[in-house]
Amino acid sequence: MKFKADEISSIIKERIENFDLNLEIEETGKIISVADGVAKVYGLKNIMAGEMVEFENGDKGMALNLEESSVGIVILGKGEGLKEGASVKRLKKLLKVPVGEALIGRVVNALGEPIDAKGVINANEYRFVEEKAKGIMARKSVHEPLHTGIKAIDALVPIGRGQRELIIGDRQTGKTTVAVDTIISQRGQGVICIYVAIGQKQSTVAQVVKRLEEHGAMEYTIVVNAGASDPAALQYLAPYTGVTMGEFFRDNAKHALIVYDDLSKHAVAYREMSLILRRPPGREAYPGDVFYLHSRLLERASKLNDELGAGSLTALPIIETQAGDVSAYIPTNVISITDGQIFLETDLFNSGIRPAINVGLSVSRVGGAAQIKATKQVSGTLRLDLAQYRELQAFAQFASDLDEASRKQLERGQRMVELLKQPPYSPLSVEKQVVLIFAGTKGFLDDIAVSRIEEFEDGIYPFIEAKHPDIFEQIRSKKALDSDLEEKLAKAINEFKANHL
């Protein structure tokens, strides 16, 4: 059998044309040194800042320091079995985490991987952890209320959707309780909540999750946990992972709330990482860009304009102070970034005033525009009344005889302080808050003993629900008090006092 030369050449030509060279070029480097969750790697010449790499043991890493002859890489895992000379592979991509509805009700780590033994998460979308915050034109001013269910906050330091409100105070003053109460209060409000635990004890996080489950709040909540035993790199990443998940809901015309518990530990984790990477330390040994660390995180919370769907992402960062020192580095940084702060005090907490909110130091810079009219009407003078009461209280310790007006003011103040107390994990609806604060500010409680205020509160809600259900209904629908409604409310309160107290 003879072959023609041109046939052979055409077959060879066809083979050459159809030849598929499946070569994947991998860029690898070698570990020079590894210690404390950071690896120094030689040989990754073309690596980008923030790029992901893979180690021999399967752990992922992130390039943070690009130096002349080496790369500083933080290990996003335990780093077990890594030694000098081991190879490191470039992944040529930035860190992405899963986002979407599939995460709701789950507990995940800082990489978005499930840690609640409820099986895999089938996410349809992944997003970059580091995203630029929305610009001015994409935003709208805060104008819708986000009710926390806590009387003292909703009346005096109201929070709006899209706001950043700092919760600040010493350890054991009830900061997490305020945040968890706010999450529980979002039930039925169409708000997706994200709780980010940074550097917390696993037992504490388990307790929070249990509390949320008890109140049915896990149905609309995602928990991101980077515990105290996790590497500093994962503690550093956790808030960014949480906010990326929150942004998904905001960008899809929904409302989300994110709690960072707490950013003091976040800054400590970042300081630890930076010092190991041999970056120059600044004030309190924090690196120079610790302000940017938090500002770029908190700027991602926003209220979007109508063209973009009018979604919102509200942030409640928590900061722990040492002995009430608000002028330390991290507290002042975060105070200047946020739109107000709720200041919790140890002395108030220990004296039984809980939530231990210092009304004088707490402020909401943009929430006033979001407060409903009914709350504004009843709590308009409340802040001033409480401030005058505190002043008089200090004065009354020295003066024995007080005039009638001062005595009345003192007594009204005592009742208002008692009125604003609230047990944990029992958020109140807006209409109930309006009724109670109306009773206090309009003087209906002046003739009730301070010790019986709690009894009054426990009884008035079921009484109105049973005898005057239209009052709550009207406050809900009108969101304001007119003269008829005020009259009805006054009548109902007097009727309750006459029959039940």
UniProtKB/Swiss-Prot annotation:
<dbReference type="InterPro" id="IPR005294">
    <property type="entry name" value="ATP_synth_F1_asu"/>
</dbReference>
<keyword id="KW-0406">Ion transport</keyword>
<keyword id="KW-0547">Nucleotide-binding</keyword>
<dbReference type="GO" id="GO:0045259">
    <property type="term" value="C:proton-transporting ATP synthase complex"/>
</dbReference>
<keyword id="KW-0997">Cell inner membrane</keyword>
<comment type="subunit">
    <text>F-type ATPases have 2 components, CF(1) - the catalytic core - and CF(0) - the membrane proton channel. CF(1) has five subunits: alpha(3), beta(3), gamma(1), delta(1), epsilon(1). CF(0) has three main subunits: a(1), b(2) and c(9-12). The alpha and beta chains form an alternating ring which encloses part of the gamma chain. CF(1) is attached to CF(0) by a central stalk formed by the gamma and epsilon chains, while a peripheral stalk is formed by the delta and b chains.</text>
</comment>
<dbReference type="InterPro" id="IPR033732">
    <property type="entry name" value="ATP_synth_F1_a_nt-bd_dom"/>
</dbReference>
<dbReference type="GO" id="GO:0005886">
    <property type="term" value="C:plasma membrane"/>
</dbReference>
<keyword id="KW-0813">Transport</keyword>
<dbReference type="InterPro" id="IPR020003">
    <property type="entry name" value="ATPase_a/bsu_AS"/>
</dbReference>
<dbReference type="GO" id="GO:0043531">
    <property type="term" value="F:ADP binding"/>
</dbReference>
<dbReference type="Pfam" id="PF00006">
    <property type="entry name" value="ATP-synt_ab"/>
</dbReference>
<protein>
    <recommendedName>
        <fullName>ATP synthase subunit alpha</fullName>
        <ecNumber>7.1.2.2</ecNumber>
    </recommendedName>
</protein>
<dbReference type="Pfam" id="PF02874">
    <property type="entry name" value="ATP-synt_ab_N"/>
</dbReference>
<feature type="site" description="Required for activity">
    <location>
        <position position="362"/>
    </location>
</feature>
<keyword id="KW-0375">Hydrogen ion transport</keyword>
<dbReference type="GO" id="GO:0005524">
    <property type="term" value="F:ATP binding"/>
</dbReference>
<keyword id="KW-0066">ATP synthesis</keyword>
<keyword id="KW-0067">ATP-binding</keyword>
<keyword id="KW-0139">CF(1)</keyword>
<dbReference type="InterPro" id="IPR000194">
    <property type="entry name" value="ATPase_F1/V1/A1_a/bsu_nucl-bd"/>
</dbReference>
<keyword id="KW-1278">Translocase</keyword>
<dbReference type="InterPro" id="IPR038376">
    <property type="entry name" value="ATP_synth_asu_C_sf"/>
</dbReference>
<dbReference type="InterPro" id="IPR000793">
    <property type="entry name" value="ATP_synth_asu_C"/>
</dbReference>
<comment type="function">
    <text>Produces ATP from ADP in the presence of a proton gradient across the membrane. The alpha chain is a regulatory subunit.</text>
</comment>
<keyword id="KW-0472">Membrane</keyword>
<dbReference type="InterPro" id="IPR036121">
    <property type="entry name" value="ATPase_F1/V1/A1_a/bsu_N_sf"/>
</dbReference>
<dbReference type="GO" id="GO:0046933">
    <property type="term" value="F:proton-transporting ATP synthase activity, rotational mechanism"/>
</dbReference>
<dbReference type="InterPro" id="IPR023366">
    <property type="entry name" value="ATP_synth_asu-like_sf"/>
</dbReference>
<feature type="binding site">
    <location>
        <begin position="169"/>
        <end position="176"/>
    </location>
    <ligand>
        <name>ATP</name>
    </ligand>
</feature>
<keyword id="KW-1003">Cell membrane</keyword>
<dbReference type="InterPro" id="IPR027417">
    <property type="entry name" value="P-loop_NTPase"/>
</dbReference>
<dbReference type="Pfam" id="PF00306">
    <property type="entry name" value="ATP-synt_ab_C"/>
</dbReference>
<comment type="similarity">
    <text>Belongs to the ATPase alpha/beta chains family.</text>
</comment>
<dbReference type="InterPro" id="IPR004100">
    <property type="entry name" value="ATPase_F1/V1/A1_a/bsu_N"/>
</dbReference>
